[in-house]
Amino acid sequence: MELCVVRHTKPRIESGLCYGRLDLELEEGFCQQAERISQSLPLPFDLTYCSPLKRCTQLADYLGLSYRRDPRIREIDFGEWEGKRWDQIGKAAIDAWHADLCSYRFPGGESFGDLCDRVDDFLTSLPNKNILLITHAGVIKALHHLVEGVSIEAAAEFSV
């Protein structure tokens, strides 16, 4: 199986807000970034899978791709933190998360380990084909762990 992974371009959201499952559209100027992505894709693909969140489907639609939506490649669920300013979440909560990046479960959400389990389930269901994924930073970090064998802690800190 050949896997090509693309992260959505910058979403339309106020700087400094926590977002994962928030269903955000892309910034108005996303077309320029999308054109660069389009030019760099090693086409064709047998299948394209896309997160069902708008910021991914909007990019796939702009690129003119036929795709399947799959909820297993949605971004991590930050639960009660979604849409809050990082400075409103509180230092103690953020420190607890940073102390245990793999297992810390966001209140009302999921942990990075949960995300990895979800992405692993997705990976094992894929056919042996040339596949494009349009997804999120958290999913790409999980793939870094699952496909490349990087420790889960290192994958959680991987910059996308």
Question: Where would I find each of the regions flagged by the language model?
Answer:
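A glycine-rich beta-strand to alpha-helix segment
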Residues: 129-140
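Active-site-proximal alpha-helix that buttresses catalytic centers in soluble enzyme cores
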Residues: 6-65, 110
